[in-house]
Regions:
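Conserved beta-strand-loop-beta-strand hairpin that lines the nucleotide-binding pocket
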Residues: 12, 25-115, 141-148, 202-204, ...
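Conserved subregion of the PPM/PP2C metallophosphatase catalytic domain
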Residues: 80, 93-97, 112-158, 163-311
Length: 311
């Protein structure tokens, strides 16, 4: 698998990824009434991982324990089922509900540890393009972590150029305030077609989150029984910046999760229709939300990060 090779995976791990992808795709075909298999590489600092997500909108799995036993998902094939995938992968989980389909996720690590890869990220180009005009960044700088999602205007190479320029600028100024980061990014994007971008900065000592955004990259903080939308300002980085970029600071409540997404997902994103999903791994949350809220007509990025442990 080319993605695993590009990430520097060993030959053995590349083989494991290939087996897992085949098993997951077969499971969708046999039981999911069609669906998608997403291959999502992610990066945090020098560490990288590869997520496989099998998404379907089929009848759901009534007995998840049985489904995870060897052979259940691929009876009649040469495969060994979801249980075998779970043993090959470094981490895995499943979410299923009656008449709402199933999302199965597994993760393969190149380096680092599971704790450093608690975030779930999906970043996909529109089908007609080979590159995404969206991007993201996660950077840890001393006592804080910066999460960023950017959406270059339009799609294709021009949008990608704007998004990657934003990534480089945010990484360069990651130790500054969110307002300063936005101002620097605006200046650097003047040579591009522009972008929308939102930042969330977690202060690990103060246990606070500072949020700032320009344009239509949406952010929210969810917790069991609660959800709060994060405020962004109108404008376009590189073209039209508000005179004073605003920062919004709030304390991080227990069991909170940050969700950020581009307008490739519709604005109705939420977890209320999925009992128990808030307590599942972040990549699984990202997979469910992408499946059910992606517009499928634009580049799409969603970042899900549990804040307990990151703060």
């Amino acid at each position: 698998m080319s993605e695993a090779l590009a990430l520097g995976f060993s030959e053995e791990k590349r083989s494991d990824v290939g087996i897992a992808a085949t098993e997951a795709a077969t499971n969708i075909f046999l039981h999911g009434r069609g669906g998608e298999l997403l291959i999502c590489p992610s990066k945090a600092g020098e560490d990288v991982c590869l997520d496989l997500m099998a998404l379907d909108s089929g009848p759901g799995i009534s007995d998840i324990t049985r489904a995870m036993q060897d052979g259940f998902s691929t009876i009649g094939t040469a495969g060994q089922g979801l249980g075998a995938i779970g043993r090959l992968a470094d981490d895995s989980s499943i979410f299923s509900a009656p008449d709402k389909g199933t999302v199965y996720w597994c993760r393969f690590l190149s380096s680092g540890s599971r704790e450093r890869f608690r975030t779930g990220i999906i970043n996909l180009a529109i089908k007609e393009e080979t590159v995404s005009g969206d991007s993201y960044l996660i950077v840890r700088h001393e006592a804080r972590t910066v999460f960023m999602v950017v959406d270059g205007l339009g799609h294709g190479a021009g949008a990608t150029e704007a998004a990657q320029e934003a990534v480089k600028t945010v990484e360069r100024y990651a130790n500054r305030s969110s307002a300063e980061i936005i101002e620097h990014t605006h200046d650097e994007l003047k040579k591009t077609r522009g972008a929308a971008m939102s930042l969330a900065i977690v202060d690990h000592n103060q246990k606070t989150l500072t949020y700032a955004g320009i344009g239509n990259v949406t952010g929210m903080i969810v917790a069991p029984g609660a959800s709060k939308s994060l405020i962004t300002q109108n404008g376009t980085l590189g073209a039209a910046l508000p005179r004073s970029p605003q920062e919004f600071v709030q304390a991080i409540a227990p069991s909170s999760t940050l969700i950020m997404f581009s307008d490739g997902l519709n604005s109705r994103v939420g977890l209320t229709a999925y009992p128990g999903l808030i307590n599942r791994p972040a990549p699984l949350i990202a997979g469910v939300l992408y499946r059910d809220f992606s517009r499928r007509r634009d580049d799409a990025t969603i970042l899900v990060a549990p804040l307990e442990g990151n703060a």
